[in-house]
């Protein structure tokens, strides 16, 4: 079954399936080219977004995620402060370094295609990735699927699932459960709190100290996201020119003489949520 580290993931927003997943797919495609010795022969890459990725991709920053993935960047280690600049540079220069090393011509407007009428039968979030040589011949082409939660899969993985592949995760935990009722039943039988039982399950995957360190890292990223949202003034990305609201509201709360009063707790929660949303 899934680990808490599969559920709580570091990555760019706004969507795990339409942003994190496509970014991982782009990077995985580059890995496939390297594995086959085709990266240096690649002169062009064409990305076709299908199904929901095409229909709602622009609003979920899917093209941005595709570019970042082709650059070889990872959601877990991406610097959000430089991501937009990296994507803008590709659009401006018309060049992209595949995997961060191999330079090709790349125009996001032409080389990322929105196939609105192509609705896949296997899964609604599909990306067809194709690499071409200098003569225009196809070197390698593969369709991947963003299955939700940042998970990705090839067609073969979905058609012939393997045990423990995280798309069809194996039930290998010490206390497996598929519902809240089953979870609470385990807790009652073992006289354990929910967090104790979950940690026992995590210890089937890795040492406790490693899990705790990873969760601490995720918590730090969450707090950093809030902090950036509270301190970054200006206008949100996009053509509407929407002004960021969180910084002004945060300063108003800080300066309020009753900033620690109980009735303002929800105001603080709201401004933190707004800060994350605007990030």
Predicted segments, located by residue:
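N-terminal amphipathic, basic-rich helices that act as targeting or association modules
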Residues: 178-228
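Beta-sandwich/jelly-roll carbohydrate-recognition scaffolds of carbohydrate-active enzymes
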Residues: 46-197
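Accessory "access/gating" subregions that flank catalytic or transport cores
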Residues: 206-279
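Short, hydrophobic/aliphatic alpha-helical segments
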Residues: 1-11, 46-49, 269-279
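Phosphate-handling active-site elements
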Residues: 29-45, 76-78
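Conserved catalytic cysteine-centered active-site region
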Residues: 1-13, 74-83
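Buried hydrophobic packing segments
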Residues: 22-29, 70, 276
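Conserved phosphate/anionic-ligand binding catalytic regions in large, soluble enzymes, centered on
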Residues: 8-26, 59
């Amino acid at each position: 079954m899934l680990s808490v580290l599969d559920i709580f993931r570091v990555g760019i927003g706004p969507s795990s399936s339409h942003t994190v997943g496509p970014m991982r797919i782009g990077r995985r495609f580059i890995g496939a080219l390297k594995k086959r010795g085709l990266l240096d022969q690649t002169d062009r890459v064409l990305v076709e977004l299908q199904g929901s990725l095409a229909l709602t991709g622009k609003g979920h920053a899917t093209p941005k995620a595709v570019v970042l993935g082709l650059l070889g960047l990872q959601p877990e280690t991406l610097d959000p402060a430089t991501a937009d600049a990296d994507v803008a540079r590709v659009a401006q220069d018309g060049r992209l370094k595949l995997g961060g090393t191999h330079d090709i011509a790349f125009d996001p407007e032409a080389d990322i295609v929105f196939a609105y009428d192509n609705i896949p039968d296997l899964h609604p979030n599909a990306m067809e990735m194709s690499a071409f040589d200098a003569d225009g011949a196809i070197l390698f082409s593969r369709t991947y699927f963003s299955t939700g939660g940042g998970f990705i899969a090839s067609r073969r993985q979905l058609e012939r699932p393997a045990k423990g592949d995280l798309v069809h995760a194996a039930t290998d935990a010490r206390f497996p459960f598929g519902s809240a009722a089953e979870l609470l039943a385990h807790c009652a039988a073992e006289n354990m709190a929910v967090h104790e039982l979950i940690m026992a399950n995590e210890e089937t995957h890795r040492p406790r100290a490693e899990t705790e360190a990873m969760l601490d890292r995720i918590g730090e990223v969450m707090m950093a996201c809030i902090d950036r949202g509270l301190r970054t003034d200006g206008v949100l990305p996009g053509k509407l020119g929407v002004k960021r609201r969180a910084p002004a509201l945060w300063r108003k709360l800080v300066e309020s003489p009753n900033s620690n009063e109980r009735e303002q707790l929800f105001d603080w929660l709201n401004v933190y949520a707004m800060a994350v949303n605007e990030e």
